[in-house]
Amino acid sequence: MHQVTIYVVASPVPINWEGPADLYKSALKSLSKRILRSQARIVGHTLVVLNSSHIEGTRAYSISGIKLIEVIKRIFKEKIGLGILGSVFKAEMESEQIIDRTLRFNSRKGRVLFIKYLINEASAKRIIDFFDKFENKFNHHHAPMDFYGGFLWPLYENEGAGCTALCLCTLIAGNLVNDETEEWKVHCKIPIKLIGGRYNKGNKVSVRDIKSTKEWHNGGGIEGVDFIPLEIYDPNMMFNWIKKTFESNDSYFKPVTENGIPGLLVDCRDLDIEGETAPFTKRPAISSFITEYYIQAGLM
């Protein structure tokens, strides 16, 4: 038996992506709910649990890296503004004890859902290959798992991940992604004026600048000059989609409950999968965020 489960933890307060001001206000409200509850996640969280006869026991993969003190420093001292969305942090692969506490606490609050995929041997081998490469060093000092960032995509060679990117790349590696994942994704263009510090020629962005900007960049302009495009999978959008599908009579995703946590079960064992290695590729274009990552990782 081979299976992979994606657990999704919603944030204490829903994150509003309508515009920069809404994003800032909703994240601040979520932060205020989290201060005395370390198991809560400011913007939500996702993690992967893998079961396969090709590994010993059960493996859980949960990456984190956003330390509150570092976020405050970068926003209020360095004034990087919404550069925080692509900023690179030192990552931590969370222990099973932390994962268990996170799921137990947030489950009591009704903030945990899951999708469990029953998979075949070929899919399991590709997922195992993906995590082997993610955990192994690409030079004498670093492995991809050492770095956390919203713009990182771990199916690009030698890149770290954010928590949702890690989960989505797990599904892609196993050839498990369908159209529903588009409903989990945020698309927006960050105005270049709201990106500061090391990412934009030392530009200083105040919180007031963010709070006074109601809309994302729209219309024309030049990428990297007028705006930076952002595509990111949002745990709260994933959570809402799972909840909606759980409550519907979907023929593909079966509603189930395990250990008191509602979720979806999907049987993908009949998928035709070629090869036993994950589909890693080279990143096609490099932004200022990726340049910083390459420097930190010793890749340039």
Task: Identify the function of each model-found stretch.
Residues M1-V4:
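A eukaryotic "domain-start" boundary segment
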Residues I6, V48, K125-F134, F239-K243:
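Generic hydrophobic, helix-prone segments enriched in Leu/Val/Ile
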Residues I6-K109, D270-I273, T277-P284, I290:
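Glycine-rich catalytic cores of cysteine/serine-nucleophile enzymes that process amide/ester linkages
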Residues V9-K29, F105-G160:
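N-terminal capping segments
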Residues L23, L28-L31, L36, L47-L50, ...:
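Generic detector of leucine side chains in alpha-helical contexts
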Residues K25, K29, K33, K67, ...:
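Context-gated lysine
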Residues N136-M300:
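Activation targets extended, charge/polar-rich intrinsically disordered C-terminal tails
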